[in-house]
Amino acid sequence: MARMSQRFCFRPGWLQKIGVTSGRRTTLALLPLMLAPLMAASTPDVPQPRPRSTGAMQTDLPELVLGQSAPLSGPSAQLGRDYREGALAWFNAVNRRGGIHGRRLRLISLDDRYEPPLTQSNTRQLIETERALVLFGYVGTPTVKAILPMVDQTQIPLVAPLTGARLLRQPFRPMVFNLRASYQAEVDQMVNSLVRAGRHRIAVLHQEDAFGEDGLRATHSALGRHGLKPVAIAGVKRNSTATDAAARQLMRADPSAVVIISAYPSSAAFSRSLQGLGSTAQLMNVSFVGTGALQDALPGGQASGIGVSQVVPFPWNRQVPVVAEYQRLMRQEQRGARYGFTSLEGFLAARWLTAALEKAGPNPTRQRLVAAFEGMPELDLGGFKLKIGPGDHQASDFVDLTFLGAQRWGP
């Protein structure tokens, strides 16, 4: 399978950060805004922990098969590709140093184009044909929702899906392990920021599926805490760029801000539609939009000022040890590697999974892997801490807000 990445170009001064939330489990030391570009460009390499090995690679031992279904083609492909690249940077490093208990890691990634029926067929193949030990790095709420019955039936762990949906958190799902913060936490942060800025007329654009419904519910809840309701609500079909009607509908309510719950193809199209109508509303996206993909889809300064909530550290801040490690291994994988929030999330998720696999022992089963996750003490990946336990599989509540500029970050 071809490995693909995105190009970012950096220009100092375009990033703003506000309202950092450490959460109850995740802590991150963020330096002042004006130092971030300098650190990204000039901070010397920080000595990093090497990928751990619990023994030399033994070629006669069976591989540890990790199964992933994600969009690797189609309108939302960059999300799946970037997550996979970040994860592979760590998995390949582990394999170079002997694997896990002498066993090589093999990530099998199947393309679902962000369409639930394909996710279902891919998952059956991963479980029945490929004999995956664990499902890892699935992308999207509607796609993950479609395979939850298989997860429950086969009792296979689903680790670090790229979704903050409530349905993976409430009620508790014993086979689902969430790394990222919930969409509720993200929307709470952005609504609090908008209200503090005096923007009370808040509209919502949502994807017409499980993801959009979850984000819409979260926005209602966040606004309700301030005694507010959405001034207008419009929907858009998944993967669609036909957003002119939705823009006109919201524009009639004269919103001062719009919370957008969609992937980057629809979000970018809607941003162009709304700007074309002369709106000055502040646009806010949840992290699933894919920051780099959104910037790529809005060239020439069209993305300037758009807000995006983030659930991982800033990928260019090498003062955070795990970010420096991520950059080093990404460069080792590919000369001139591009960094980004989604690939960093994949990298962090891969590190979390291998820590549990090490703890599960030389002959891991699905049950042993679950026990290993739940039995781990707080895991500090190097400035990004994760903690779960029996009855609570939410590892991080970290949320940060970023605002895009006319130039893209880079590399």
What are the residue ranges of the model-derived segments?
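Extracellular/periplasmic Venus flytrap/periplasmic-binding protein
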Residues: 121, 166-167, 174-278, 315-324, ...
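Short, solvent-exposed amphipathic alpha-helices that sit
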Residues: 79-96, 118, 158, 186-189, ...
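Periplasmic-binding protein-like
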Residues: 126-139, 159-161, 203-206, 254-264, ...
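Extracytoplasmic "Venus flytrap"
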Residues: 50-86, 110-116, 139-140, 205-212, ...
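Segments of small-molecule ligand-sensing domains
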Residues: 332-344, 354-410
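Extracellular/periplasmic periplasmic-binding protein-like sensory domains
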Residues: 271-346, 406-410
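Beta-alpha junction/loop-to-helix N-cap segments that form part of ligand/metal-binding clefts
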Residues: 51-53, 65, 78-85, 97-167, ...
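N-terminal export leaders
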Residues: 14, 24-28
